[in-house]
Amino acid sequence: IAYGCPDATREQVIEAAKRAHAHKFIVQLPGGYDTVIGEDGGTFSQGQKQLLCIARAMLTDPAILLLDEATSSIDTRTELQVQAAFDELMAGRTSFVVAHRLSTIRNADCILVMRDGQIIERGTHDELLAADGFYADLYRSQFAQ
């Protein structure tokens, strides 16, 4: 978590992990917060890797946040936990999120819908659903039961 922020205190690292919803699984590791993680992420699930990355971003506290397909390879149950962490991370900062899973951007102040490299729609989630255009079609296709 402290990678890229070597002067962070242990308390700051733990606080970032708690805010990212990663603390619970970290303390269950044999090495806890002293666990060394290899390049491939070891035996962590995709969701756990995401939460660790979110904790790292929270610790560095960037003014602008760029997220690219942040929930693309996790299951829906884990996505809820990761989304809660993202909501915490994005609060009070400018965030650009590239997403195909529309649940990731549902709470955005402004959504730009792109197709073939062009912006074709713009608005909040509710505005785009009400417009009944491309975004609404995508949303219905993702959440059809």
Regions of interest found by a model, annotated:
Residues 25:
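Conserved phosphate-donor
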Residues 4-7, 14-22, 32-131:
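ABC-family ATPase nucleotide-binding domain "signature/switch" substructure
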Residues 130-145:
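C-terminal boundary and immediately downstream tail of ABC-type ATPase nucleotide-binding domains
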Residues 1:
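Catalytic-loop signature of eukaryotic-like protein kinases
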